[in-house]
Amino acid sequence: MTRLQKLLCLLAMTTLAQASKGELRCGTSLVGDGAWPLEVEKTCGRPDYVSEYPTATMPGLGVVQTEEHWYYNPGPQQFIKRLVFRNGKLVRVDSLGYGFHVARSPSCSTSTLRHAKTEYELIARCGEPASKRVEWQIPSKQKNREHWETTQPVLVQEWLYEFSSNQFRQVVTLRDGQVTDIESRADR
């Protein structure tokens, strides 16, 4: 191995170690687990897209826990980062696919929908949907060897996109902000 190859290998391992620890490098600084949204914004700048969801409600009190997804799109040469905050605390940094250039005015087609992988990509490429449905689903409990696993509710959304009169409506299903299904629907 040449010296350059060793250096690149070391750099790649360092980057992977940071990603696994839930850290995000912004310039010369790092933000990691437990960071406040204000600290992240001060260090990394404003996110490209933010979505917020209630994750727990109590009768008489209303929403008692929230989750925010912050997306940073550095362009086509780097990966999109999704930061997950629970109750105002950074709990996870996800590395998604390569970034992209965002058009000034979104132009959407069924092909664009089929290539989108996240809620951010849908918004950036197609704009807001005509309508949304949001619900929390609890996966069925399964016995894992000798004990029952605890389950976390999963945020499931359906986004309806309408196109010209000669195209079917498209319903995009997202689970935890990731596109999982797209189906065509005739006008009703």
Where are these regions (language model features)?
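Hydrophobic h-region of N-terminal signal peptides that target proteins for export
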Residues: 10-19
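Residues within mature, well-folded domains
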Residues: 20-188
